[in-house]
């Protein structure tokens, strides 16, 4: 970790020693800018009971630019497309160097609790959410059962 900026070292150490509830983030052994992330589906959401794997990459200009994050686990969510890309303001125009990896991961976890079909990335899912929320949530639960119940890989 010696060649990394101190900030990345400190953030990584904090993620390892003080993990946020329901979130695991582990740096790759060969690239400390790349993290394997697992987020547990929040209680009382259609994603409850699932464990969602993501990848997070810190670009060379981090923290001046947001980390690159995407879901590896298939998910039925209006703000996450089929490639795993996430529609979240702090990953785009609302990014600030004051934000940290931990903040990003907590925000993604919160997005699982409160899908926003009015700011979609997956337009078909958002339309389904708007026209029949009950059915869309049932499909999200089904996808969670099908794709997100595997144990977390280390």
UniProtKB/Swiss-Prot annotation:
User: Which Enzyme Commission numbers does its entry carry?
Assistant: 2.3.2.23
Q: What region holds the UBC core domain?
A: 3-149
Quaternary state and interactors = Heterodimer with ube2v.
What this protein catalyses is: S-ubiquitinyl-[E1 ubiquitin-activating enzyme]-L-cysteine + [E2 ubiquitin-conjugating enzyme]-L-cysteine = [E1 ubiquitin-activating enzyme]-L-cysteine + S-ubiquitinyl-[E2 ubiquitin-conjugating enzyme]-L-cysteine
Q: Which family does it belong to?
A: Belongs to the ubiquitin-conjugating enzyme family.
Q: What's the protein called, per UniProt?
A: Probable ubiquitin-conjugating enzyme E2 N
Q: What keywords are assigned to this protein?
A: ATP-binding, DNA damage, DNA repair, Nucleotide-binding, Transferase, Ubl conjugation pathway
Stored PROSITE patterns? UBC_1, UBC_2
Query: What pathway annotation does it carry?
Result: Protein modification; protein ubiquitination
Q: Which cysteines are joined by disulfide bonds?
A: none
PANTHER family documented for this protein: UBIQUITIN-CONJUGATING ENZYME E2
Organism of provenance:
Dictyostelium discoideum (Social amoeba)
Give this protein's Gene Ontology molecular function annotations: ATP binding; ubiquitin conjugating enzyme activity
| Top EC group | transferase
**Catalytic residues as annotated in Swiss-Prot or TrEMBL:** 87
The entry's function note states: The ube2v/ube2n heterodimer catalyzes the synthesis of non-canonical poly-ubiquitin chains that are linked through 'Lys-63'. This type of poly-ubiquitination does not lead to protein degradation by the proteasome. Mediates transcriptional activation of target genes. Plays a role in the control of progress through the cell cycle and differentiation. Plays a role in the error-free DNA repair pathway and contributes to the survival of cells after DNA damage.
Give the record's GO biological process terms: postreplication repair; protein K63-linked ubiquitination
Q: Which InterPro entries match?
A: UBQ-conjugat_E2_core, UBQ-conjugating_AS, UBQ-conjugating_enzyme/RWD
Provide one Gene Ontology cellular component: nucleus
């Amino acid at each position: 970790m010696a060649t990394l900026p101190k900030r990345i070292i400190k953030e990584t150490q904090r993620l390892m020693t003080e993990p946020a509830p329901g979130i695991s983030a582990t740096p790759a052994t060969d690239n400390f800018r790349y993290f394997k992330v697992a987020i547990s589906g929040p209680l009382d959401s259609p994603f409850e009971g699932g464990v969602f794997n993501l990848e997070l990459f810190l670009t060379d200009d981090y923290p001046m630019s947001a980390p690159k994050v995407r879901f590896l686990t298939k998910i039925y969510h209006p703000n996450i497309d089929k490639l795993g890309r996430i529609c979240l303001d702090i990953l785009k125009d609302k990014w600030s160097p004051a934000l940290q990896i931990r903040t990003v991961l907590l925000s993604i976890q919160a997005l699982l609790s409160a899908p926003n079909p009015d700011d979609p990335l997956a337009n078909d899912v958002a339309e389904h959410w708007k026209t029949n929320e009950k059915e869309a949530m049932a499909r999200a639960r089904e996808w969670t059962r099908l794709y997100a119940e595997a144990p977390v890989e280390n």
